[in-house]
A protein has these predicted regions:
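A short, N-terminal "cap"/entry segment at the start of jelly-roll beta-barrel domains
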Residues: 1-43, 132, 139-209, 213, ...
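C-terminal functional regions that serve as terminal interaction/effector modules
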Residues: 1-4, 201-206, 212, 219, ...
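Short, flexible loop/turn elements at secondary-structure junctions
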Residues: 31-33, 51-56, 64, 72-73, ...
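A short beta-loop-beta micro-motif enriched in histidine and acidic residues
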Residues: 35-46, 53-68, 83, 202-211, ...
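A short beta-strand-loop-beta hairpin characteristic of the jelly-roll/cupin
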Residues: 53, 57-90, 96-100, 105, ...
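Conserved metal-binding segment of the jelly-roll/cupin
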Residues: 81, 87-109, 114-119, 245, ...
């Protein structure tokens, strides 16, 4: 899905569907291999590109599918999740996990766009999908991305540790990018410069059905990812990358997205000879591991 193709459609949707008609404005990225009517990118992954215009506000709701937001464009918007107000900046990852109230608004002056990634297909298949409307949330002063901002150091007031399933709801891109650059500099022999978004209290995946990662390709690097059982999604945050998947080759510009089926190797090439490229990846690994079907070939 080329962002240059999606963006004009999103802006047109903004003209045609004000908030009075639809409180959330999304273009679903449906994989024709699964049937367009199913509106899914893989067996367990739903993708959508959502637009928020200046001054808009979408009321609070909660739902059973887990979701994340990878911010694609713009600034000045925010998402409030469980009372925590999360600023939205390009490349940030924001969680809206199962059962948590969330709403969003825009105080800036330019359109804001993000990529929605949900485990909706599997939750819908289990006949467990629903959504409930809610009231506007009171905003808390605390923020998880500040309290859990250093690796290996966690809050423990009077020796008590957090038992929240999602202690961190916002993963700033500035920090993930710095971690990748630091890892690349510290381990120049490392082929796959990659980090995983995790719960800092447990080390487990940030959400319990889908996994989320950031990958850095060194200048001019070609990296072969092994064939694994889970399907996966690649979204380019920065740079220019060629993705070879089975017999198809995609050239990804910034904000472009593509999918790879399970059990297929993927080769990624950074087309920039003098600068790194950065890729956001979502996959079904946590689900496959829990079901005992995870496999690398």
């Amino acid at each position: 899905w080329a962002y240059d193709t999606l963006r004009p459609l999103l802006m047109r949707a903004g003209d045609l569907t004000p908030m009075e008609k639809a409180e959330r404005r999304v273009l679903v990225m449906a994989n024709p291999g699964h049937g367009l009517e199913k509106m899914q990118a893989s067996a367990a992954i739903y993708l959508g590109m959502q637009l928020l215009l200046p001054g808009e506000w979408a009321p609070s709701h909660r739902h059973t599918p887990n979701a994340v937001r990878m911010i694609v464009e713009g600034e000045g918007a925010w998402t409030t999740v469980d009372g925590e107000k999360c600023p939205m900046a390009r490349g940030d990852l924001i969680l809206t996990p199962t059962g948590l109230w969330h709403e969003h608004g825009h105080d800036g002056d330019q359109p804001v766009v993000w990529l929605d990634v949900l485990d909706l297909p599997i939750v819908y298949f289990m006949e467990a999908s629903y959504v409930l409307p809610g009231e506007r949330q009171a905003v808390k002063a605390s923020r998880g991305d500040r309290a859990w901002s250093r690796a290996g150091v966690v809050p423990s007031p009077v020796f008590a540790r957090s038992d929240k399933r999602n202690p961190v709801l916002r993963y700033p891109w500035a920090e993930a990018r710095a971690a990748l650059l630091g890892l690349a500099a510290d381990q120049p022999e490392l082929d796959a410069v990659q980090v995983t978004y995790v719960n800092p209290e447990t080390g487990e995946d940030a959400e319990n059905i889908l996994g989320f990662y950031a990958l850095m390709l060194r200048p001019g690097q070609t990296l072969r990812l092994p064939a694994r059982s889970p399907a996966q999604v690649f979204h380019l945050i920065e740079g220019r990358v060629q993705a070879q998947i089975v017999d198809r080759t995609f050239t990804l510009a910034e904000a472009d997205t593509c999918c790879a089926p399970g059990y297929e190797a993927v080769t990624l090439t950074n087309l920039h000879p003098d600068a790194p490229s950065f890729v956001f990846i979502a996959d079904e690994s946590p689900l496959h591991r829990k079901l005992g079907v995870y496999e690398t070939r």
